[in-house]
Amino acid sequence: MNIVKIEAGGKNIAVVSSSEILIEDVQSALDLMATVQYETDSNRIVINKSLLSESFFDLKTRLAGEILQKFINYRVKVAIVGDFSIYSSKSLRDFIYESNNGNDIFFLATEQQAIDKLSMLK
């Protein structure tokens, strides 16, 4: 895992990359949050969707809700970057739409969009 700390808009943003899946369950999400907080002192994280288990995008597993609720509970804002058009589930599209209209969780196409979005939040 590689974590790069970026300052944008006066905010510290952690951009996490890896060649393997980092979030497979709630505990691995909590571990990632703790590592990022410790290494970067940031509560804003950008991750590529490839770092998430595919079961995250199957809402029937409830994994997305459980994981994202932890981010919200710990006041960590996260932007997930990737091409989400490959998923045909209307429920997932609605979930992404609602998340993008909130203040904590975002699904965006590019890393730069993610950094820009997280830097504009309070």
Model regions and ranges:
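Amphipathic, Lys/Arg-enriched alpha-helical "gate/interface" segment within cytosolic domains
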Residues: N2-K122
